[in-house]
A protein has these predicted regions:
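Conserved beta-strand-loop-short alpha-helix elements that form
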Residues: 140
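N-terminal auxiliary "cap/dimerization" subdomain that precedes the catalytic jelly-roll/cupin core
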Residues: 1-57
Length: 178
């Protein structure tokens, strides 16, 4: 659970040093039933939805603006804003796969990525890490790092992108929103 500054300090150090970082939070902070996920999709503004029918994938952007989103999403956005440098932009996207279907082949992003696994399981391969992410697992992937994500079942993964210059060190504590 994100109740002290250890997570923020570890994440900030990993971002500053451009190292992969793994952690986890209480899965109840991200747990949602499929009915609430479908409601989130159905009520999300059309201009903030991207659909890839050939991969059974839906992407919802700017979730932090929604009142119905899990509070942890807004908490993570605030954390990233607090440790980011001026001029950086923080993005959030929910990747929803409605089957165990291919996702992304080997890729590297031009921005730093923080993945939060919310529902279902995915196989993540990044550097020397080859692990199954389950609800509550968090992984930071520095920009330019090769990685592969393979859904093992229907899933929801929150992805936070950080564009711009390098992250500064965390200066303050970080607590979960109630």
């Amino acid at each position: 659970m994100l109740t002290n500054s250890n997570f923020a300090k570890g994440l900030s150090a990993a971002m500053h040093n451009k190292q992969v970082f793994e952690s986890c939070i209480d899965s109840e902070l991200v747990n949602q039933n499929w009915d609430s996920i479908i409601d989130l999709i159905d009520s999300h503004p059309d201009n903030l939805i991207e659909r890839e029918p050939n991969k059974n994938r839906i992407m919802l952007t700017a979730l932090y603006k929604r009142g119905s989103v899990k509070p942890i999403i807004k908490t993570i956005i605030r954390l990233l804003e607090s440790i980011s440098t001026s001029g950086q932009r923080i993005y959030d996207t929910a990747f929803i796969n409605l089957s165990k279907h291919e996702s992304y082949s080997l890729r590297k992003d031009t921005m730093d990525i923080l993945l939060l696994q919310a529902k279902g399981r995915i196989q993540l391969e990044v550097k020397k890490i080859n692990k199954v992410l389950e609800s509550g697992d968090i992984v930071y992937i520095p920009r330019g790092t090769d990685y592969t994500i393979t859904p093992l079942q229907s899933r929801v993964t929150y992805c936070f992108g950080i564009e711009g210059e390098a992250i500064k060190s965390a200066q303050s504590g970080f607590g979960a929103e109630s």
